[in-house]
Amino acid sequence: MTAILERRESTSLWGRFCNWITSTENRLYIGWFGVLMIPTLLTATSVFIIAFIAAPPVDIDGIREPVSGSLLYGNNILSGAIIPTSAAIGLHFYPIWEAASVDEWLYNGGPYELIVLHFLLSVACYMGREWELSFRLGMRPWIAVAYSAPVAAATAVFLIYPIGQGSFSDGMPLGISGIFNLMIVFQAEHNILMHPFHMLGVAGVFGGSLFSAMHGSLVTSSLIRETTENESANAGYRFGQEEETYNIVAAHGYFGRLIFQYASFNNSRSLHFFLAAWPVVGIWFTALGISTMAFNLNGFNFNQSVVDSQGRVINTWADIINRANLGMEVMHERNAHNFPLDLAAVEAPSTNG
């Protein structure tokens, strides 16, 4: 008789902690990226909620005219926002300990920089966490690649654009009205609607919505019935079953007859790759467009009106867009400068008399 004795390996506290962090058996996977994601996301969320409710007005333009953004200072859910850090701070790193007092930090919009930097770090870690979980489960990494599109867009708006413009005060205010404010100012200063990368982004977002709706409706309409006509089609399936639940050939045939034969996919993998790639590539281009316009590589402009042989202006749609842009720029930071930069940079025309 042979007895085999095995020595029980003692696992250190650090080893047990590492196993728990990287375990795929947890209800929610943590991962090493999650170790950084959780505190940064909680910090950004907590400060956002507190500042949205109670932050005092912020001197966004650096001209001693503070702007209110919180609920307790007269705003509602629609008009409220976290006001960006003051132009007086520019791009300086502005933690609480850099200010003479907490009141000064709040007056200069310190919470905005704190929220944005923690938020960007947390969403980047969330993307890394997606890759980490995919790796440990033996999956391919494309979920994290797809998520990189909104991460790139957020980074472009909250970090690259302020860097290009020279101040965090040019960042997007964190609120519903703040989003619209950035859109209007962006159009006025960069003519974003005439930028080809923005056009690709619009095609990606709206096209992705259209394709998702088409795909979902086709799948739902071509289920393989496992029940009688008197029972719900849903009763014939169980969650996670290996058998196909819908007939892609039927869906392909329907769509091919509805438009034309080659407008539909007969391969499920090709179809789902297309559904993922279309909006992701579009949003990548939008983020790239924001990043280039941050350094004033703007959309197409038609600042010179079309004139006839007599020198008379032929009014075009471009003239209307130009006037709208100038009007929006006049209203933006109206107390910080008297004229839009486009007008202030041009010499005054000479007049006879």
UniProtKB/Swiss-Prot annotation:
The UniProt record lists the keyword Signal: no
Subcellular location: Plastid, Chloroplast thylakoid membrane
Keywords: Acetylation, Calcium, Chlorophyll, Chloroplast, Chromophore, Electron transport, Herbicide resistance, Iron, Magnesium, Manganese, Membrane, Metal-binding, Oxidoreductase, Phosphoprotein, Photosynthesis, Photosystem II, Plastid, Thylakoid, Transmembrane, Transmembrane helix, Transport
Modified residues (N-acetylthreonine): T2
Ligand binding (Fe cation): H215, H272
PTM note: Tyr-161 forms a radical intermediate that is referred to as redox-active TyrZ, YZ or Y-Z.
Reactions it catalyzes: 2 a plastoquinone + 4 hnu + 2 H2O = 2 a plastoquinol + O2
Enzyme class: oxidoreductase
GO biological process, alphabetically ordered: photosynthetic electron transport in photosystem II; response to herbicide
Site (Stabilizes free radical intermediate): H190
Gene Ontology MF annotations: chlorophyll binding; electron transporter, transferring electrons within the cyclic electron transport pathway of photosynthesis activity; iron ion binding; oxidoreductase activity, acting on diphenols and related substances as donors, oxygen as acceptor; oxygen evolving activity
GO annotation, cellular component aspect: chloroplast thylakoid membrane; photosystem II
Amino-acid positions noted as binding chlorophyll a PD1 in the UniProt annotation, renumbered to this chain: H198
InterPro entries referenced in this protein's UniProt entry, alphabetically: D1/D2, Photo_II_D1/D2_sf, Photo_RC_L/M, Photo_RC_L/M_CS, PSII_D1
Modified residues (Phosphothreonine): T2
UniProt-annotated site: Cleavage, residues: A344, A345
Cofactor note: The D1/D2 heterodimer binds P680, chlorophylls that are the primary electron donor of PSII, and subsequent electron acceptors. It shares a non-heme iron and each subunit binds pheophytin, quinone, additional chlorophylls, carotenoids and lipids. D1 provides most of the ligands for the Mn4-Ca-O5 cluster of the oxygen-evolving complex (OEC). There is also a Cl(-1) ion associated with D1 and D2, which is required for oxygen evolution. The PSII complex binds additional chlorophylls, carotenoids and specific lipids.
EC annotation from Swiss-Prot or TrEMBL: 1.10.3.9
Gene3D superfamilies per the UniProt record, alphabetical: Photosystem II protein D1-like
Task of the protein: Photosystem II (PSII) is a light-driven water:plastoquinone oxidoreductase that uses light energy to abstract electrons from H(2)O, generating O(2) and a proton gradient subsequently used for ATP formation. It consists of a core antenna complex that captures photons, and an electron transfer chain that converts photonic excitation into a charge separation. The D1/D2 (PsbA/PsbD) reaction center heterodimer binds P680, the primary electron donor of PSII as well as several subsequent electron acceptors.
Similarity annotation: Belongs to the reaction center PufL/M/PsbA/D family.
NCBIfam families the record matches: psbA
HAMAP family in alphabetical order: PSII_PsbA_D1
Record's subunit section: PSII is composed of 1 copy each of membrane proteins PsbA, PsbB, PsbC, PsbD, PsbE, PsbF, PsbH, PsbI, PsbJ, PsbK, PsbL, PsbM, PsbT, PsbX, PsbY, PsbZ, Psb30/Ycf12, at least 3 peripheral proteins of the oxygen-evolving complex and a large number of cofactors. It forms dimeric complexes.
Protein name, per record: Photosystem II protein D1
Source organism (scientific name): Amborella trichopoda
